C-alpha cells in the first residue's frame, strides 16, 4: 500500500513539473506500452461490481485531496453553439456528469466492459435539440493550446471508438484512459492539462495519465 501511495505521489509530482510534451509542435505524446488482448479483465466500479456495457457511471479522479473531482461537459468555447469541452471538476466531492460506456465492437452478448478493449464514451446529460448528438468523446488537436484535447461532439468513426480503459491498480480499482491511433498498435495516455488561459483542468493526450475510479449512480 505504501509503495502504491508513493508511486501515485511521484506520478502526480511529475505531472506538476514543466512538461516538454506540452509543446504546441508535439500534439501526440509518448506512446504507452501496448497491452495484449490476453490481459482483458472486467472493469470494476468502486464497489467491486462489474461495469455494465451501455451503463451510466461517473468517472472521478482517483487521488483524493488533489483538487479534482469527476468529469464534466463544459461550454468553454463561446464560438461553438454546443458544449464540447471535457473538464475535471475542481471540487473533490463533485462526481461530475453521467457517462455512458459502450464497447466499440457491437456484440449483443457483451454485458460487461472489459479492460484493454476499445470503448466509446458519451455524456448522458440533457441538451437542446441542436446539441443532442454532440456528446461523444473524441480527440481533437487545438492549435491555440498546442494540445490534442479530449472533446465532445458528434460520433466520428475511427476517432470516437479508439479509447481503452487500462488497469493501474487492481486492488484499488484504479484505471487510466488511453487513446489508440486507428490502424496502429500505439496508444497514448489521456492526462490532465491545466489550461492557463481558461483556468480550468482539461484532458489531453499526455505523458502522465489521469487516474480515475468508476462510480455507479447509486453507491
From Swiss-Prot:
Let me know which tissues express this protein, per UniProt. Accumulates specifically in tuberous roots and tubers upon tuberization. Sporamin accounts 60 to 80% of the total soluble protein of the organ.
Assigned keywords, A-Z: Signal, Storage protein, Vacuole
Against SUPFAM superfamilies, the record matches this protein to: STI-like
Record localization: Vacuole
Q: Identify this protein by name.
A: Sporamin A
Tell me which InterPro entries the record gives: Kunitz_inhibitor_STI-like_sf, Prot_inh_Kunz-lg
Q: Name one Pfam family in it.
A: Kunitz_legume
Q: Does the keyword Signal apply?
A: yes
Any one annotated GO CC term: vacuole
- Give start-end of the signal peptide: 1-23
List the source organism: Ipomoea batatas
Q: Primary place of residence? A: other
Family statement? Belongs to the protease inhibitor I3 (leguminous Kunitz-type inhibitor) family.
Q: Name one GO molecular function term.
A: nutrient reservoir activity
Relate the protein's function as given in its record.
Major tuberous root protein.
- Top-level taxon in the UniProt lineage: Eukaryota
